[in-house]
Amino acid sequence: MAQSLAAALALLLLPAAAPAARVVESFAPASAAAWTPYQKAPKPVAAATGIAFPLPFSKAVDRAAWDKPVALDLSAATAFEIDLACPRPEAIRQFGLYFKSGGGWYAASKPMPGPGLQTLVFAKSDFSTEGSPAGWDRIDGIRLSPWKGEALDAALVLHRIAALDGGSLVVVRGTSSCPNDSERAVAAKTTERVSRLLIEAGIPHSLVTDDDLVNGALNNAAAALLPYNPQPSAPQLKALNAFLARGGKLGVFYGASPALASAMGFKLGPYTKAERPDRWRSIAFDDPVAWLVPPRIWQKSHNLFPVYPGDRNSSVIAFWENARGVRQPEPALVVSPRGFWMSHILLNDDAQSKKELLVALCAHLDPSLWAPAAARAVRDAGRVNDFQSLFHALSEIERRLPHAADPGATRALLDEVRSLSAQIQAALAAGQHRHALLLARRQRQLVLRADAAVQLPRPGEFVGVWDHDGTGYIPGDWAFTANHLAAHGVNALFPNLAWGGCAHYPSKVLPASDTLRLYGDQLAAVLAAAKPRGIQVHVWFVLWQLTGAPDDFAARMKKEGRLQIDAGGNTRPWLSPHHPANRQLVLDAVAEVARNYPAIDGIHLDYIRLPDSQSCYAPTTRARFEAATQAKCRAWPADVLAGGKRNAEFRRWRTADITALVADIRAALRAANPNVKLSAAVFGSIQPDGGNIAQFWPDWLRAGSVDFLTPMNYTESSAEFSSLVRNQVAQPNAAGRIYPGIGVTADESRLDPADVARQIVLARQAGCPGFLLFDLSGTLRDETLPALRQGLTRPTPP
C-alpha cells in the first residue's frame, strides 16, 4: 500500500540546486514605492512575497506600466527569467519587459503561460530597440508593461527578475564566415535556435560573433560552439587553432572548412545533396545510453557536408537514417579529443531530443556543464501541463486518478516519481550530476505518462492531423501512416498535396511535383489507405506559393505579370491573389480534385490571404482596385501604403477581394462535388480590416462560405490559447465550426504531450467539436499520439 500523500511528498519539497542566475530585481515587498506608475496606472502594493501591480483592464486602457530607475550592466546576460503570477492570466495579452538605456529602450513581450506562479524567459534576441539605447552595459531603468487582454480587472504579482549570464561555453554566430546576406540570416537564426535550446536546458553560455574571435572572444572559454560558420577567414582559423592548442574544445555544425576539420582530427567530405527527400530523416547513435540521448533524433536534412574520422583518435558516434530507419553511409556526428562535428546544422524539429543532444555534446566538451543541466532538469521535472511544481503535479494527478483507464497502474507511476525524488537528491548531494540528470528526465517522463492517463476521452470528437510533406511518415507507404493514425484515434488527415505551382497528383491544371514523379499519385494512395480505416481525407492546398514549382512555370508566371510585387517594385515568388488568371487557376484546381477524386471529404485552404503588408502592388492589383473603387490613384503605390491617403480604403478592398475569392471557391466546389466540405487554416487573431494579411474570416463564417475553420493557435501559453479559442467561437455563425489548430511542432510553439492535452481540454471547454495537430512528424508519431491515446483519445465503450 502506498504511503500517505503528505508523507510521500515531503521529499519533493527538498531544495534543488538551480542554475546560476544573477538577481537584478527581487521585488521586495517594502520596495513597492520605488516603482512609479506610468501615465494613469495604479500604484503597486506590497504582497506576501513580492509586489502586486493592479491591472485596471475593465476600463478603456491598452496597458498598464511602471518604471524603476536602476544602474545595471547586463552586457554579460544571455537571457532573463521573470517569476510572476496572475490568477486571471487572460487579462494580459502580452507581458512587456523594457530596459531603458540612455536615449532608448530594449523591449520584448510574451504572453502569460497560465495561471499561478510562472517563469517567463526572455532571450536577448527577443528584444528589439526603440530609440537609441546606449548599450546593455548602461541600463538605467526597468519598465514593466502588461498589455490588456480580456476586459477584466486583475492583479499581477512579480517576485524576481534574474539575468542568466554566460559561463565557460561560448556560442559563435556566423557573420563574416558566411559568404552573403542570405547565409548570414541562416547563421543568425540557427545560432538563436541553439541558444534557446541551451537556455531551456539550463546551460549557461555567452554569445559572440566570429568577427570577435580575433579579439580574444575565446580567451576565458573552455568550449565553443559554431552553429553555422561555414568558411572562417584565415585570422579566424588562427584564433580557433590557438584555442584548440591551449586545450579548448570545439563543436562544429555543417562546417565547410577542411583546414578546421583537419585541426580537430576529422576529414571533410564533399557537399552532398539528397537525391530523394526521405534520404536523411533521423540521427541514430551507436550507443544512445552511454551518451544520454534518445534512440532516434528526428531531423529532415536535405544536404550535408559529410565528415569522417581523420585519425585513430576520432570516431563516428552517430549515423543518419532514412525514413524507414535504415542506416545511411554518411556519419551524422564524429568526435575527437578536440571536440565534435555534425554534418548539418541543427534544425528545429524534435526540439526535446535536440535539447538532450546539445546537453550531451556540450557536456562532452566541458563536463562541468552536467551540473547546471541537472539542476534545470530537476526543477522542470514537475512543470508539465499547468503544474507549477512536482508537488502540484502529483497532487492534481492523484486527485484525477479515478479518470484513468487503469488507476492502479497510474498510481504506480506516481509512486515511482516519489521514490525517484530521494534518489535525485542523493545523487546531487554526492556530486553525481549526470546521474541526477538521468533520474530527473525519467521522473518527468513518468509525470507526463501519468498526466496523459488521467485525461478523459470524448466520443465522436474530430481528431485531425496536418501532413505538410503530403507523403505520410514514410514516402511510398501510406498504409503504415494510416494504420498508425487509426490505431491512435486520428480520424481526419489533411495531406498537403497542392501548391501554387505544383501538385502531388496528376493534374491538367497544375504542373507535376517531384513528389509525384518519385512516389506516384499521392492523393489516390492516401485515399486507398485512409478511407478503409475510417479516416477522412481533406486535401490541403497551399495557395500562391511557388515552392516546388518547375522553373519554366515560375518563369511563365513572371512573364505574364502574375507574381506579387512589393512596394519597391521587386517581384516575389508568390502568385498574386488579385490577378484574375491566378484566381481562376485556384478555382480550376479545386474543381478538378473534387471531380476526379470524389471520395475526398474536403478541400482545405491555406494561405488564403496575403503574406504580409508588402504585397501586392502589381499593375493588375492597381487596375482592379481602381475599378472597384471607381477612383484613380495619383501616386502608386504611395497612395495605398501606410500613411497614404487611401491606405485604409486599400486594406478594406484587398480583404474584401480575398473574402470574395473564398465565396467563389465555395461555388466552384459545390458545382463540382456538393458532398465535399470546404475548410481553411486561418490566423488565430482577428483584425477588423483583415490586418496586414487581408484575412477577415468572420465574414466567411457569416456568409456560410466555409464549413469549418482551423485557426492556427500556435502558442505555448495555455492562457493565450484559451483566450484565442473563446474569441473565435464567439464569432457569428461560429458554433460547431471552429476546430483549433494546435502547434505541436510549429515554428511558433513546441509542445510536449501534456501541453497538447491542456490545449485540447481548453478547446473542449470552449465548445469546439474537435482539433487539428500540426503536424505529422516523428515527434507526433512517437510521443504525442501515444500519450493522447492513453486518455484523451482512448477508445470508449459503445
Enumerate the language-model features and the residues they cover.
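Active-site-adjacent "subsite" loops/lids of carbohydrate-active enzymes
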Residues: 460-465, 523, 527, 538-597
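Glycoside hydrolase catalytic-domain groove-lining segments
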Residues: 628-750
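A glycine-rich, often tryptophan-bearing local segment used as a flexible ligand/cofactor-contacting loop or short
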Residues: 230-303, 310-316, 321-323
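Catalytic domains of carbohydrate-active enzymes, especially glycoside hydrolases
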Residues: 197, 201, 477-502, 598-599, ...
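Substrate-binding cleft of secreted/luminal carbohydrate-active enzymes
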Residues: 443, 705-721, 728, 734-798
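Extracellular ligand-binding/catalytic regions of CAZymes and related secreted enzymes
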Residues: 166-171, 193-197, 225, 328-422, ...
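Helical hinge/lid and interdomain linker segments adjacent to catalytic or ligand-binding clefts
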Residues: 179, 183-264
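Extracellular ligand-binding interfaces
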Residues: 54-133, 138, 147-157, 162-165, ...
